[in-house]
Amino acid sequence: MVIVGAGFAGYNAARGLRKYAPDAEIVMINPTDYFLYLPLLPEVAAGLLEPRRISVSLPDRLRGVTLVLGTVTHIDLEDHKVEWLDPEGRPGGIEFDRLVLAAGSVNKLLPIPGVAEYAYGFRSIAEALFLRDHITRQLELAATTADRDERDARCTFVVVGAGYTGTEVAAQGQLFTERVARQLPALRNQPMRWLLADLADRLLPGLHPRMSATADRVLRRRGVEIRVGQSVQYAGVDSLRRTTGEEIATRSLIWCVGVRPDPLVEGLELPTDHGRLQVHETLVVRGRAHVFACGDCAAVPDVTRPGSITGMTAQHAQRQGRLVARNVAASLRGDDLEPYKHHDLGFLVDLGGWAAAANPLNVPMSGPAAKAVTRGYHLYSLPGNRTRTGLDWAVNAVLPPRAVQFGLVGRLNQATSPGTRFSS
């Protein structure tokens, strides 16, 4: 059995297959040797957690699963074969009896002039660390310039996309810049300007309005400028233009507009729904009894809302990964397959500091109580490093971390060449 991808869906599929098909040979193909717990990525960018805390070793946690480091380049569904390139560009291939597609998603990049060249993506450890270095550098450079306009521009940060990621990045980022500025006497009276923009009419448009209102209130109270119903029209190296026509001088455009299914899906030439593979309620790909799909790359029918598909969330991916393991094992035995059914446990948004918005089991919460629930859920959901993560949080509560650069940002911010700031 071959699993493509090691996100929430792929990781849980591999864990389940070890249990439900202990005698099967399980091969996982993934570009990295770790599972990334994406919900805590904003805390890495803000210097609150070390990258290792949310990077869980696959060889350590998935004993009995063969990990192949590589990026899948081609899947032959007729001959049951998967081909890949390893990190050094060497080709490889393997045949399969059952295939689980859990390739996940990548940054959604819109055709807006300058975004690919000058915006910063936020989907990987590398991007989070790069962004942290970039923000730290901007403030340190602002502290040494006598040019007021340049200082203001370097202390201005624009986040586009007010979903989960964008809202949390703006919340954590604003607190991070305030913390860094306190280390720099020259910035003691310098405002840290953060703007959060989205074409929707409110923050967190996919969540309950009460959670949106909580996030809006917390961020505005901290001075974050909320710009709903608008986005970016053009981005340059030191400024951007909003769709309202306003020009904003900034060196920091952070792109959190959303995600799209991994491009691997497009090359399969199978039926899709909004770019996601069409599957039955049992997670079997339509017309391919030996192929299963789950997570962000699969358009799984939502039985609680007939006619719609499940959202691209970690909660769904985790549950679908567990179900796909049971169904793959059942298909090998010739047993009936289970349909995907779910009951939402609620949603959580960490707003930094002691603030959060949550509705566990549809019970609305905010403030420290929501924060406790949010962190408790993350500790429960982390497949590893729970103790170290909890200790980091405890220490940071009394001893705030100091910000330093790690040298990831090259001269003129060109650590990556133009057009490659977005990693997949």
Model-assigned labels for residue ranges:
Residues 6, 86, 103-104, 244, ...:
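Glycine-rich, N-terminal phosphate-binding loop of Rossmann-like dinucleotide-binding domains
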Residues 151-207, 214, 225-227, 310-330, ...:
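Rossmann-like dinucleotide-binding core of oxidoreductases
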Residues 66-158, 254:
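FAD-binding core/adjacent interface of flavoenzyme oxidoreductases
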Residues 1-74, 157, 164-207, 254, ...:
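Beta1-alpha1 glycine-rich phosphate/pyrophosphate-binding loop at the start
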Residues 117-147, 238-241, 247-319:
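FAD-site-proximal beta/loop scaffold in flavoenzymes
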Residues 21, 316, 320-424:
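C-terminal, flexible cofactor-proximal segment of oxidoreductases
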Residues 9, 104-107, 170, 259-261, ...:
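Short glycine-rich anion-binding loops that position phosphate/pyrophosphate groups of nucleotides
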Residues 23, 67-82, 94, 174-281, ...:
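A Rossmann-like FAD-binding core segment of flavoenzymes
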